[in-house]
Amino acid sequence: IYNSILQKSIAKTKVHNYDIFLDNFLEGDNIPKEVYLNLINTVKEETAPLKRYIQIRKKILKLEKYHNYDGSVNLIEFDEEYEYDRAKELILESIKPLGEGYTAKMAYALSKGWVDVFETKGKRSGAYSAGVYGVHPYMLLNYNKTLDSVFTLAHELGHTLHTLYSQDNQPFSMSDYTIFVAEVASTFNERLLLDYMLETTTNSRERIALLEQEIRNVVGTFYSQVLFADYEYQAHKLVEEEKSVTAESLSNIMKDLFDKYYGETVEKDELLSVIWSRIPHFFNSPFYVYQYATCFASSALLYENAIKGKDDSKREDSLRKYIELLSSGGNDFPMNQLEKAGVDLKSKETIKAVSSQLNSLLDK
């Protein structure tokens, strides 16, 4: 099945005279192939923090050997409950650096019954923010009082505010933003919440739980997705170079990537190499997952510029550009929107902002 998908992609590349198969998938949003290649190549140079994280986990968990599935084990037990009203207060306090206007919009969104909050019988799982132009966004939650659900609320509110700013400033025809920028606002808000809770908590166990949650987020949303993006690229290269496509050759690509990313820190279990066969995006939405990583990298750089910057005037300018990004909807190609906000995804430094973030979290 996957071979037929690869063959179709390369056939379409030839029929439409694309220079490379990447152009087939990236041209819709006018994304240069250099962005994709810069992402996968730079991250392979920045795996040291990832290996450091595994070594720390291995030491704390007192394991002689570390397997991929050990990543699901929490470093500590933390079962504190966060009532919904408390979660709202935490988030509203955390986003104050974005200004009074942003804070007022979020407070309004939380007070007008736009959110279906709690789990109920027959309700679908997950969380989602859906915009309705000329009305307002609606939010689906399944809030269960866990720390994770607090961050999910912050995440979805990021989407909701992005939608509000876009719809308030753009006509209907240009109000929808692309997937390429969609996760910037959501992960930005998660970072604000993390830093606020780390600064205000007096509970050492909560502090560890916060750090562990965010580190897992960096690994899962950035490193893992770039590994998968690299896999897709190499799998397509097999067909482009007229090499044999078999389960073994596909599994060897995955094995080599895990070796590159994790080195000797993780045991190479046999099933690890066939993980490609259960990633639905590979089959249903080729060259989609890299966008999770580009959004995460963009968000990390914007956060450093707009929130952490030491120069007041530059920080204020970066914050203004960030709000303009949220307000831009689909009025331009996403690369142009991000560049106006100060993000150059063709630069290695933009990608390295995430590895620096992971190192900083590990230091804490």
Residue ranges and their predicted role:
Residues 1-138:
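Contiguous, non-catalytic segments that form substrate-binding/exosite surfaces or channel walls
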Residues 12, 59, 63-69, 153, ...:
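C-terminal, non-catalytic "cap/extension" segments appended to globular domains
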Residues 16-23, 65-67, 125-136, 156-167, ...:
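Active-site-adjacent bridging/hinge elements
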Residues 17, 144-164, 186, 191, ...:
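Active-site recognition of the HExxH zinc-binding catalytic motif
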Residues 24-37, 69-80, 100, 134-147, ...:
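Glycine- and acidic
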Residues 39-47, 88, 215, 250-258, ...:
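Short amphipathic alpha-helical coiled-coil/interface segments
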Residues 93, 97-104, 130, 159, ...:
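Conserved helix-loop functional segments at active or binding sites
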Residues 177-206, 214-216, 220, 295:
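Post-HExxH zinc-binding segment in Zn-dependent metallohydrolases
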